[in-house]
Amino acid sequence: MKQVAIVGIQGVPAKYGGFETLVENIIGDNCSPEVRYTVFCSGKDYATRLNTYKNVRLKYIPLFHANGVQSTPYDILSMLKCLHGYDTVVILGVSGCIFLPVFRLLFRKRLVANIDGLEHRRAKWGKFTKWFLRTSEAMAVRYADVVIADNKGIQDYVRETYHKEAVLIAYGGDQVLRNISEERQMEILRKYGVTPGNYAVSVCRIEPENNSHVICEAFASGGRDIVFVGNWERSEYSRGLKQKYAEYSNIRMVNAVYDLDELYALRNWCCCYVHGHSAGGTNPSLVEAMFFGKPV
């Protein structure tokens, strides 16, 4: 049985973003019986530490959060714990890939890297951070046996910039389908205080680059209902928006929803999906929303 380690995410069960959702759809019933996965998780981000989840081993890095400035030491420490006992290491994101020249000297087996969405081009980063992420990205492409791109734009970028062929593995959307009765779906809509076809949905991390403030401002002035799902308690920016727009009853600011039945019902009966991202790679939530054939 092949032993595969996955590093670079907050962890599972998923409660954060796209890579976490990706891993949720790799493991479980989708696992090959010939592969044993180990997922490295942030001990700081999980109050309850499971030993296994969906027949996958979980190991925790206790000292760091998986995101922000701590993501680099978090990823590097995760890699160091992969030096023995694994046939393949899958790295999601480039934060810790600055370490790959050293890691490659110590780990001689298969290394797979998904470089995500040109992190160094995000407007929120300063010059040093952009340089650091650009260098980490270059190390990921150079030292990985396989580079994964989740859309053709990233695949073309890798080819043109690094003269290396990335493997294109696009996100799907069929995993959102649920065998759930219409009666149950109506119960879910009532829980969120909306009626079929009379509300919009948006699912994202609440941050400036996703134009969360623009979305709130638009719905505050327009009056249409929106169920806005995101991490509203994570940052000063998100908490500020939540406080500013708390008086608008049509803006339902909901913390991250990972109940697939609830997400299905909300998307299935909305009038449209609102997508404000201005940076990053392919957004899985957008792909999932498109699967319902709703206006975006």
Predicted segments — roles?
Residues K2, I9-K15, D29-A66, G153-T161, ...:
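N-terminal strand-loop element at the rim of the active site
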Residues A265-G281, K294-P295:
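Acidic donor-binding loop of glycosyltransferase active sites
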Residues K124, G172-N198:
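Acidic anion/phosphate-binding donor-loop and adjacent secondary structure
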